[in-house]
Amino acid sequence: MGQKINPVSNRLGIIRGWDSNWYGGRKYGETLLEDSRIRQYLNARLAKASVSRIVIERALKLVTITICTARPGMIIGKAGQEVDKLKEELKRITKKDVQINIYEIRKPELDAAIVAENIARQLEGKIAYRRAVKMAIASAMRMGAEGIKIQVSGRLNGAEMARSEMFKEGRTPLHTLRADIDYALAEALTKVGLLGIKVWICKGEVYEKRDLAPNFAVAKNQSRRPNAQGGNNRGGDRNRRRKGNR
């Protein structure tokens, strides 16, 4: 089933956190619909800002929105004018106070959503699909990906019959739940019809427990800097006891 299911949803609660973090109770449906409106609005409003992921957290009177983007400057604007304007627009949608956090993606070549969107924009610009895909694969492998798989579907090169073509390099173990696999789907509207682009990127395997909290800065620091003492630090404890006895 690893080949059929969405790799992101298959790893929720294991190595991947949720994009919506709140308790809705009886208003679950209304809150979920509002989340969908927020994401649709932000994706349309920030179409050129290379937005990868939008995480929404809710408190009683506050909505915290974390936007993961490769171009934070386009969202923040000069002296923060654009992000303040965006905050006021979101307040009208949610009818609550809104806090916006911007998280910069430092390696967009390893982000499936950004890679898929870039390929889609190139296909709309009449660039050959094989060239666009091979450039994306080369960039991802150069930036340290363990493997990447890209599927392009539709009327490729204007053919009368639609077909799918797959490009692979490296390893993408979809059945291995500890494998950190990012997945995204994008669509390109061309003169011959709609083309679909699916991207799978394997960034390695996660062996230690990962913090699934939506606070990206905390999760990033914890994953990069594990506890210096470690789980088995008998020598250090013994030295501290000797110093205390003296």
Curated annotation (Swiss-Prot):
Keywords: Ribonucleoprotein, Ribosomal protein, RNA-binding, rRNA-binding. GO terms for cellular component: cytosolic small ribosomal subunit. GO terms for molecular function: mRNA binding; rRNA binding; structural constituent of ribosome. It holds the Pfam family Ribosomal_S3_C. SMART domains: KH. Residues 38-106 form the KH type-2 domain. SUPFAM superfamilies: Prokaryotic type KH domain (KH-domain type II), Ribosomal protein S3 C-terminal domain. One of its GO terms (biological process) is translation. Transmembrane segments: none annotated. Coiled coil: none annotated. Residues 218-246 are annotated as: Disordered. Belongs to the universal ribosomal protein uS3 family. NCBIfam families: rpsC_bact (TIGR01009). Part of the 30S ribosomal subunit. Forms a tight complex with proteins S10 and S14. Binds the lower part of the 30S subunit head. Binds mRNA in the 70S ribosome, positioning it for translation. PANTHER family: 30S/40S RIBOSOMAL PROTEIN S3, SMALL RIBOSOMAL SUBUNIT PROTEIN US3C. This is Small ribosomal subunit protein uS3. It comes from Porphyromonas gingivalis (strain ATCC BAA-308 / W83).
